[in-house]
Amino acid sequence: MDKALNIGKTKVTTKIKKESKEADKITKLQLMSTDKYRATVLQPIINEIARIIDYGQPCVADGTYGKMNGGHYVSVGANRTTALNLHNIHIQSFSSNHFKSGDSIRYKAGLIERYGKDYFEFVEFLQQHKPLNLTKQDLVNITLKASTIRLNLKRDEKTKTAFERIELRNIINLELGIYEQKFCEFYKE
């Protein structure tokens, strides 16, 4: 009888701890600034989407395989507005992204080699977008969409052609609804 009582108490204690942890997480999210929410909740999901799109590809900057990040051509510190645009985020090795300050010269060369000069110029053009001024609720809504997109992409993770990778970036940028259409879609004329 005592053993059954102890098991019951343990289950109740575990449930209370779990509920408390969930409440703490919700409170922490509520107290986050809008930019902190973008950086810690939404940005990792967007970066993972870019990595899934580029699945099977080597680092855009140094051509290596291994531990990968979603690296930004235009750094987030330099321009927050382009931080969530998938055309600005490509698979990049951890080493190139972190220890070589983004490796921007080789990143540029890699974009041109993979997708062409017109695409690179489009990525540069993204910097002309006006500031986003998204609210935290906007970011929460975008996070929900991005999470669903990420899950669907994971179900069909395979190597894609350069054209398919650009098309996916076009489609997903539009689905997320963050940017004006001309900043979402690249089409070679």
Could you say what each language-model-derived stretch is?
Residues 38, 42, 81, 99:
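Conserved aromatic-histidine-acidic binding/catalytic patches
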Residues 66, 88-119:
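Short Cys/His-centered divalent metal-binding micro-motifs
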Residues 123:
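Catalytic cores of secreted/periplasmic lytic hydrolases that degrade extracellular macromolecules
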